[in-house]
């Protein structure tokens, strides 16, 4: 697994640096956010939308929720659809749909892109491995590392 990390470390480090540099200039508005917004936490029932599982709720920018949702979609759906030659939503499609109900300024779009580009999952997995000084890592973490290595250059 060390070789997997070494192959992609520089790219993810560079993405993190650029994202942090952009976000330090940001003036993102803050409110309560879900912080783990994914398709399984959004329920549609009789024309109403409900969001469940608020156990990771925190204060932050609503753009963080949108970025988390987009990154999960990118990682779990778009990458594989792209490789199979199937249609998938690109960033323009996603932002177009989102903007129908939530106007985004150019600055907000740049901030959103920085949050999307920040390699949150990579940093989390690497942190978990190295914090515990593991000689052996569970299969699930190894699979996440392999997936991230495979997707490091994929953009929506």
Model-derived features: where do they sit?
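ATP-dependent phospho-/nucleotidyl transfer catalytic cores
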Residues: 1-32, 93
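Short helix-capping and hinge/turn segments at secondary-structure transitions, especially at repeat
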Residues: 14, 18-21, 42-43, 47-50, ...
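Active-site acidic catalytic loop and adjacent metal/ATP-binding pocket
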Residues: 20-64
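Active-site activation/catalytic loop segments of kinase-like enzymes and analogous catalytic loops
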Residues: 63-103, 116-134
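Helix N-cap / loop-to-helix initiation motif
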Residues: 104-108
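ATP/Mg2+ or Mg2+-diphosphate-binding catalytic cores
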Residues: 122-156
